[in-house]
Design a protein with these regions (language model features):
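Adenylate-forming
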Residues: 26-31, 37-43, 52, 89-91, ...
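Residues that mark the start of a beta-strand
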Residues: 12, 50-51, 127-128, 206
Length: 258
């Protein structure tokens, strides 16, 4: 056998998640990025070689993607077989967790614990607590900003297809209550009316996203056909508006409107 080093071997696609969207037939959403260090990690504030906790199921895009990006950054990854509010806090203390992924349902269950139980755990190691995947009630957001800290609690809005993302910190949210953040560098966002025309700031329309490199650079479907507007813009089906500072606010789902 040769002593020569092996050629580098990298998977062509780093993930293929299943999804049916809100009402559609199941399909595979295949990421076009190779299985290398994900550049989104830097935009999410990840720092190499820390500890991450993913209490959500890895067959969901959020915890899978956040967990795999953390592994690529050299994190020690802590996972659970099911979510338990008390166990989550205990694991943060036990492992000195610096990064955690949550959805609002998890946050509500954690907040429903008696205050004496919540306060019994040391969660001071947390640097980033990302929540996403569903709207977060304002009262719950406020409670977690006070509990975790405004620069620790973070929110992300986007889809599995990765056409674009917005992010917002708790501190920013207090100044822009109800917002899901500003568009991340490398992507563009626009709000259009029912005729596809851009609307003025502050006016509600359908939210469209586009990578700066163009439509279709981030994913392809197996079992479905991608649809895009003129110029490659794509919508996740959400309605919303952008304020004068560039912050996005979601107001409804297009499919829920009469």
């Amino acid at each position: 056998l040769s002593d020569a080093p092996l050629d580098e071997a990298t998977a062509k696609y780093w993930k293929a998640m299943t999804s049916g969207g809100s009402t559609g037939r199941p399909k595979l959403i295949v990421s076009k990025d190779p299985a290398t260090v994900e550049p989104l990690g830097e935009k999410l504030g990840l720092v190499p070689e820390q500890v991450a906790l993913m209490p959500g199921p890895l067959y969901h895009n959020g915890p899978f993607s956040m967990g795999m990006i953390a592994l690529q950054y050299g994190y020690h990854l802590v996972i659970t077989s099911r979510f338990d509010a008390s166990e989550t806090l205990a694991l943060i203390e036990q492992h000195g967790v610096q990064l955690i992924y949550m959805v609002p349902t998890m946050m509500q269950r954690m907040w429903r614990l008696p205050s004496s139980e919540r306060d019994a755990y040391d969660i001071s190691s947390l640097r980033l607590a990302w929540h996403m995947a569903a709207p977060c009630p304002a009262w719950l957001k406020e409670a977690f900003i006070e509990w975790f800290g405004g620069d620790v609690l973070m929110e992300l809005y986007g889809g599995t297809e990765a056409q674009g993302f917005t992010t917002i910190s708790g501190t920013e949210w207090l100044a822009h209550r109800g917002s899901v953040g500003k568009i991340v560098e490398g992507y563009s966002l626009k709000i259009v009316d029912s005729e596809g025309r851009p609307v003025p700031r502050g006016e509600v329309g359908e939210v469209y996203l586009l990578p700066d490199e163009g439509q279709g650079v981030s994913y392809f479907y197996i079992g479905a056909e991608a649809t895009a507007d003129v110029g490659g813009w794509e919508s996740l089906g959400d309605m919303g508006y952008v304020d004068d500072d560039g912050y996005l606010y979601l107001t409804d789902r297009r499919s829920d409107m009469i």
